[in-house]
Design a protein with these regions (language model features):
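Small cysteine-rich, disulfide-bonded extracellular modules of the LU/uPAR three-finger superfamily
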Residues: 1-92, 98-234, 240-275
Length: 275
């Protein structure tokens, strides 16, 4: 469960391919699903049990906060489906859309109890069905994506736009790099031109890989020959101006003078999704 392919593509296009995410929805619409909605909103059964999707004000989520390896927002109001028109049993998932009917699927999630354990939704015909404030939690991992980027994405779901899309991203080499953007950078030490700039046009089309959406660079990332030695190189970061977007660990290695610092296009990939 997690974000839809529509939303994953929107975020990848914004961060890397120069197409802004655009206006964020002020209202989300909750749906019920009989099985995994996957990336597209499959298995929706809302109309079987209710007169329509549940309207929810997007701003009624908490500010993003770190919980373990995730940035998370939590509902601050109830999600009300209204009075059921048929009894429902063992319904496992709900989703959010940007319209009361049709529209774009934004993401699907399991129903959970107050402890975060997955549960099944059951109700009788004529019951009033709702999910209490605090029961809806949306978390995005910060294992490879920065806190800055995840907060942009979560706040978009809360109704706050992401602003203008960057026209370039810059690749940095480091001996230490964390999700909050703290970096021990060696790029300027080993590379004549410093960080390597990737124009938004130099990314591939977005493709599906497993439960993720993925892009890769269409040109090599070539820093040239190292102008100085460096020890303990173990991380690569991709920045938008001064803000870290994504990062990755690499096998620790020492850079020697004259070493060609090249990442082939086929090896530099960015994935966003539900792993």
């Amino acid at each position: 469960m997690g974000l839809s392919s529509y939303l994953l593509d929107k975020f990848l296009n914004h961060h890397f391919k120069g197409t802004a995410a655009g206006t964020a929805p002020a209202t989300l619409y909750g749906s019920i699903h009989s099985a995994n909605p996957a990336l597209t909103g499959a298995n929706e059964v809302t109309a079987t049990y209710f007169s329509g999707r549940a309207s929810y004000t997007a701003s009624n989520f908490s500010a993003p906060a770190t919980l373990g390896n995730y940035r998370q927002i939590v509902s601050t109001a109830s999600l009300n489906f209204g009075t059921s028109i048929a009894a429902g049993s063992n319904l496992p998932y709900f989703g959010f859309w940007d319209a009361a009917t049709g529209g774009n699927f934004l993401g699907g999630f399991a129903f959970t109890d107050s402890l975060g354990s997955e549960i099944l939704l059951n109700f009788g015909n004529g019951d009033t069905v709702s999910r209490a404030s605090g029961s809806i939690k949306i978390g995005l991992d910060i294992n490879a994506w920065s806190i800055y980027a995840r907060d942009l994405q979560l706040n978009w779901l809360k109704g706050t736009g992401m602003g203008s899309a960057p026209s370039t991203n810059d690749v940095a080499l480091a001996t230490a790099l964390t999700a909050d953007g703290t970096i021990t950078e060696i790029t300027a030490t080993v590379a004549t031109g410093g960080r390597f700039s990737i124009p938004s046009a130099n990314w591939s089309a977005i493709t599906t890989v497993g439960n993720t959406r993925q892009i890769q660079t269409t040109n090599d990332i070539n820093f040239g020959a190292a102008i100085a030695a460096a020890t303990g190189f173990n991380a690569i970061g991709l920045f938008s101006s001064t803000n870290l977007i994504v990062f990755a660990s690499v096998s620790t290695q020492n850079i020697v003078v004259g070493q060609e610092l090249i990442i082939p296009a086929s090896k530099f990939k960015v994935s966003l999704g539900n792993v």
